[in-house]
Amino acid sequence: MWPAQLLSQLLPLWPLLLLPLSLPAQGSSHRSPPAPARPPCVRGGPSAPRHVCVWERAPPPSRSPRVPRSRRQVLPGTAPPATPSGFEEGPPSSQYPWAIVWGPTVSREDGGDPNSVNPGFLPLDYGFAAPHGLATPHPNSDSMRDDGDGLILGETPATLRPFLFGGRGEGVDPQLYVTITISIIIVLVATGIIFKFCWDRSQKRRRPSGQQGALRQEESQQPLTDLSPAGVTVLGAFGDSPTPTPDHEEPRGGPRPGMPQPKGAPAFQLNR
């Protein structure tokens, strides 16, 4: 019984099993046709020492019909465009931010205005100020002179004058001279203050050294004996206590006659 039940359950699943088999068959129909097989190897001739295989070269792959926009064919009768390829619609700002678009140039013979065709640039007959006051034409102008050797010589443009040595009537701001004068005065005053400070400091250093030298000289000239009205005392070697001199010592026998002896004062003894 169970095989019959199993077959009855598997019968509805047969279409699902046939579905994957039909998909590869449909996909194979869309594939490109297989490449032609190469011809077999043929013998070149009876005189050839060995078999030579001649193969036919396959044709090169066909290129896509797409052509880049920048590459355009130029007909033999037409002139190439004035602007570079790819710039007909204007230079892109993201790809070439540093590109400069030059305008057309018109010569004087054609009757064009050189100032209008070259905006932002100096005119062709622009003159420079010369040191002696004359106007020097531009080297590219028609007023150039020709020397005997056939060389075209033009006067070189004069360099700009320094503003400090030029005339005051040439449009220099007078405030500039006032600023320079005040700056010079400030520098001179600051230099004088610094010099005065250094001089006072050097004098203060010399005074203490002079005083110390005077004190040392006085100490060297001071005598070893001390002259006093009471008597002459000699400074001892081991102390400052005065020692009586032999001239003021009393005689051994006693006081001299005629000398008043103080009351209550004991007699001076030699052997203390």
From Swiss-Prot:
Topology of the protein relative to the lipid bilayer: Single-pass type I membrane protein
GO terms classed as biological process: cerebellum development; dentate gyrus development; gamma-aminobutyric acid signaling pathway; gene expression; glutamate secretion; homeostasis of number of cells; regulation of immune response; response to stress
Function description: Acts as a ligand for PILRA in neuronal tissues, where it may be involved in immune regulation.
Entry comment on modification after translation: O-glycosylation at Thr-136 is essential for recognition by PILRA.
Domain of life: Eukaryota
Residues linked to a glycan: 136
Location relative to the cell: Membrane
Spans within the Cytoplasmic topological domain: 196-272
Bias (Polar residues): 209-225
Region feature (Disordered): 25-93, 205-272
Keywords noted in UniProt: Glycoprotein, Membrane, Signal, Transmembrane, Transmembrane helix
Signal peptide: 1-27
Listed GO MF terms: protein domain specific binding
GO cellular component, one term: basolateral plasma membrane
Protein name: PILR alpha-associated neural protein
InterPro entries: AJAP1_PANP_C, PIANP
Keyword hit for Transmembrane: yes
Extracellular side of membrane: 28-174
Pfam families, per the entry: AJAP1_PANP_C
Residue ranges of the TM segments: 175-195
Primary location: membrane
Organism encoding this protein: Rattus norvegicus
